[in-house]
Amino acid sequence: VQESVAKAFCALGNYLDAKSEFFDPDEIDEIEKKHLNFAMKNTNVVDAFNQARTALFYRIRGQHRHARTQRMIRYYFAAQDIHERANSTYFDYRQIAEQLKNTDLIFRIQRLLELQAQACHDITACLRQNTPYHYNIRVEKALMGTIQSLELYSKEHAEQNNVLLALQTLIDNLKSINWQLRQLEQETSENDQTAQIHTEQITGLKNILSVIGSNFTFESPLFRHAIRLS
């Protein structure tokens, strides 16, 4: 199970690296070719997630929750949310790159994505070596620099409404990715308790209602996963 989750984060890191290549101002003419590579990396992520999810379900079927399994569930949901955030911004990469090619903002976005990709690879290594993951403060500094750069660009190009909206959405999603990476370091037993995809038998009406109620919130990874499936 742990190896399957490690592979999921490895695929996710490769995916974020591929996304960062869209923000290279010196290779704008190569963007169409990069779309194919990006699509392949996305397919690899989906396949890795499916394998990790299957491994988790087999591990917990009919069993009480184990601390290590719960930890892997938390990591799985974090990886899924990171992928969702990174994949939810749709815009013309060529147009954005052309607009930003003479600014530092495009370099900052690329650098932030590269650091987030590296964080995913770091998580992969930690899972395989069974060592604690530590959030790299450089990722947070890169995010703060990107936000400040966007604020400056927005003031100087207030007329570019569509571009600014797309950029703000992108930065918001990258901010959410950073949050997930921080949370993995700050993981607690309370966080584990919220990540429930187990199939253990629950008896008694009171207990059933309690379990349902505890997951019927947007703070519950299980609830967000159900929305994605729907």
Q: How does the language model describe each region?
A:
Residues 2-230:
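Cytosolic regulatory and coupling regions of membrane transport/channel systems
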